[in-house]
């Protein structure tokens, strides 16, 4: 049986995977990046480093690789005159993009397990009394749940395009859902929180009347209602907040090791290991015995028995708390 080292967040091996990725990653950055605040959550920290400003992708890459490797990486939806100012008023807001967030786990009942990483027993509380350590939680994200999120995203895109004449961009969040972003300029960028709330409520179907007897092919809400679409399930606060942080496209999500990825065609999206940039194999040491769906495949793990699995799967399982990546095997 393998030796448990109480994986507290991330190991140096996981950090090396992330650093090697960012050495060559082509991050999708806004053309006006000098007007954006950048932020990150470093490895081994529960707090964010904020109020960062960069003028080029090279400057950003140097900072990430050599000074502050990110577990999570963001830039602001807002444009500021002084994005590095620590006081929000001093930043001087100039407008914001329009954001929508769809979390697939809000659409499904997912299997959740809380356990002790030392003894492997299921535990209800946040601490194992037997071993005096904090417990870990694993939530199984299924392909079926992601499909539900994708369907909600498809409905949202239709509303934004057909009812508002907007050109939304869709991104897989890197973990459990989708981000939809509209690059805003002029009056769109200057929408305040109340106006954005009205847009959020519209796409959620709040206050939209029923249209019994209408055609499924009718435009707008008449057709949607008669197709059984009563609204889109979004995180309303994300849309309302004019100073929201956005995950940088092509960055890595620290809870999965998957890429925050542009989805140009929703019909082509698949929740599988191609969303991971990592190749080769890892030796993975499971904390518990479990059979679970991982990126579209069923994986069987036995507590304390090392297993050789693809790096994409091993890193995902590590970041999802199911065990530790012990070694990299080419």
Curated annotation (Swiss-Prot):
Keyword Transmembrane helix: no
Keywords from the UniProt entry: DNA replication, DNA-directed RNA polymerase, Magnesium, Manganese, Metal-binding, Nucleotidyltransferase, Primosome, Transcription, Transferase, Zinc
CC cofactor: Mg(2+); Mn(2+)
Alphabetical list of InterPro entries matching this protein: DNA_primase_S (IPR002755), DNA_primase_ssu_euk/arc (IPR014052), DNA_primase_ssu_PriS (IPR023639)
Highest taxon of source: Archaea
EC numbers on record: 2.7.7.-
Gene Ontology terms, MF aspect: DNA-directed RNA polymerase activity; metal ion binding
One Pfam family cited in the UniProt record for this chain: PriS_C
Effect caused by changing residue 165 to I: Partial destabilization of PriS-PriL complex
Quaternary assembly: Heterodimer of a small subunit (PriS) and a large subunit (PriL).
Protein name in UniProt: DNA primase small subunit PriS
């Amino acid at each position: 049986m393998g030796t448990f080292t109480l994986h507290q967040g991330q190991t140096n091996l996981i950090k090396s995977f992330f650093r090697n990725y960012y050495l060559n990653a082509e991050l999708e950055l806004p053309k006006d990046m000098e007007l954006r605040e950048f932020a990150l959550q470093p490895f081994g920290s529960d707090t964010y480093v904020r109020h960062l400003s960069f003028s080029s992708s090279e400057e950003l890459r140097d900072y990430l690789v050599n000074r502050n490797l990110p577990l999570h990486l963001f830039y602001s939806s807002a444009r500021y005159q002084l994005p590095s100012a620590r006081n929000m008023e001093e930043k001087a807001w100039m407008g914001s993009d329009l954001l929508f967030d769809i979390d697939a786990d809000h659409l499904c009942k997912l299997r959740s397990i809380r356990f002790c990483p030392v003894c492997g027993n299921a535990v209800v509380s946040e601490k194992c009394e037997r071993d005096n350590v904090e417990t870990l939680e694993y939530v199984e994200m299924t392909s079926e749940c992601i499909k539900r999120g994708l369907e909600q995203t498809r409905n949202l895109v239709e509303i934004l395009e057909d009812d508002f004449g907007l050109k939304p961009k869709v991104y897989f969040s890197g973990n459990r859902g989708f981000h939809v972003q509209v690059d805003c300029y002029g009056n769109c960028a200057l929408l305040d929180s109340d106006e954005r709330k009205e847009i959020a409520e519209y796409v959620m179907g709040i206050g939209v009347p029923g249209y019994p007897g209408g055609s499924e092919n009718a435009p707008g809400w008449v057709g949607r209602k008669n197709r059984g679409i009563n609204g889109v399930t979004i995180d309303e606060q994300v849309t309302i907040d004019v100073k929201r942080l956005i995950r940088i496209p092509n960055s890595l999500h620290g809870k999965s090791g998957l890429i925050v990825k542009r989805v140009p065609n929703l019909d082509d999206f698949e929740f599988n290991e191609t969303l991971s940039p990592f190749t080769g194999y890892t030796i993975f040491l499971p904390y518990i015995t479990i059979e679970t769906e991982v990126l579209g495949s069923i994986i069987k793990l036995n507590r304390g028995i090392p297993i050789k699995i693809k790096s994409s799967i091993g890193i995902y399982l590590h970041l999802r708390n199911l065990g530790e990546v012990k070694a990299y095997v080419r």
